[in-house]
Amino acid sequence: MREGKRKNMSNKKVLTGIVVDAKCDKTIKVMVSRMIMHKTYKKIVKKRKNYVVHDEHNQYKCGDVVKIQEHIPISATKRWIVI
């Protein structure tokens, strides 16, 4: 029973971010912000990273908040999809 539940669970990463670019066809750029503590100075620092994400129906615009999930490579740079 326990093994059956484990097969259904996904171990892919899910992140939340803001769409910063939606100019390309079926592709958006999503900026994900994280707050981390600096190891030496113990100060909270905001880290940002942009992800190239597959948007199948071109439904997202700049400023939208989206959830993205890891996926098999779709192109040379796209490894995330919108959920």
UniProtKB/Swiss-Prot annotation:
One of its GO terms (molecular function) is rRNA binding. Keywords: Ribonucleoprotein, Ribosomal protein, RNA-binding, rRNA-binding. One of its GO terms (biological process) is translation. The keyword RNA-binding applies. It comes from the Bacteria. One of its GO terms (cellular component) is cytosolic small ribosomal subunit. Part of the 30S ribosomal subunit. Belongs to the universal ribosomal protein uS17 family. NCBIfam families: PRK05610.1, uS17_bact. One of the primary rRNA binding proteins, it binds specifically to the 5'-end of 16S ribosomal RNA. This is Small ribosomal subunit protein uS17. It comes from Ehrlichia chaffeensis (strain ATCC CRL-10679 / Arkansas).
